[in-house]
């Protein structure tokens, strides 16, 4: 993330306010971890509002991670597929409507009224990015869409989690980095396997030639997925 060096005043966002509040708490020597019960339930207005673009096999997994985070409120889902079976297994039913239903059902369990209908489904990702109340987006779609959506999201002032690979070519990757820096956004990608010590050991072993010449590599990419790797 690039820090703002412009001395002129800027309107403060909910995210910026939360960050400044956290810094202030630290300066007052509060405990590093404060139980949520001290402050009571987190108000919806204090949560980071997230929209999930892409709700297939990988996308629904990311969505569920965010559902388990009390600092986040999922307010929208987006997918061109309304809903269908057969993503990774024949009985798996995923897509835009299943994702919306899961989000609403989750928040309904937490609501005093026992009902919730605050997650809006979209077909076009541009409609999601046009929402001023969306703070961040997840982009879990076919690879050739990553650069387009990331650049557009940065331009619209959203922070971004984008699945790997970030781009299909160096030029697209450079455009993504430039857009994120220009608009001072946060971009994270899901390349955690590269940090896994076991994976690093295997890679180093192969590169060092300790297993001899590699004759064949087999890749597993959701063979039962009728709508692509996502």
Can you describe what each PLM-predicted range is?
Residues 2-156, 171-186:
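N-terminal glycine-/serine-/threonine-rich beta1-alpha1-beta2 phosphate-ribose binding loop
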Residues 159-161, 166-230:
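A contiguous active-site-proximal alpha/beta segment in oxidoreductase catalytic domains
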């Amino acid at each position: 993330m690039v820090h703002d060096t412009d001395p002129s005043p800027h309107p403060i966002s909910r995210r910026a306010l939360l960050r400044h509040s956290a810094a202030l708490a630290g300066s007052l020597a509060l405990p590093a971890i404060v139980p949520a019960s001290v402050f009571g339930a987190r108000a919806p207005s204090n949560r980071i509002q997230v929209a999930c673009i892409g709700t297939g096999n990988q996308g629904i997994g990311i969505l569920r991670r965010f559902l388990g985070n009390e600092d986040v409120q999922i307010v929208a889902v987006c997918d061109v597929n309304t809903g269908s079976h057969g993503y990774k297994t024949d009985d798996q039913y995923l897509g835009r409507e299943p994702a919306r239903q899961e989000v609403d059902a989750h928040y309904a369990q937490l609501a005093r009224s026992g009902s919730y209908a605050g997650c809006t489904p979209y077909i076009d990702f541009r409609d999601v990015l046009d929402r001023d109340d969306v703070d961040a987006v997840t982009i879990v779609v076919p690879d050739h869409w990553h650069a387009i959506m990331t650049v557009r999201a940065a331009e619209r002032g959203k922070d971004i989690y984008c699945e790997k690979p970030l781009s299909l070519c160096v030029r697209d990757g450079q455009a993504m980095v430039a857009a994120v820096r220009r608009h001072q956004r946060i971009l994270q990608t899901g390349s955690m396997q590269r940090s896994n010590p076991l994976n690093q050991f295997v890679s180093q072993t192969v590169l060092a030639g300790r297993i001899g010449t590699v004759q064949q590599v087999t890749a597993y990419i959701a063979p039962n997925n009728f709508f692509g790797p996502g």
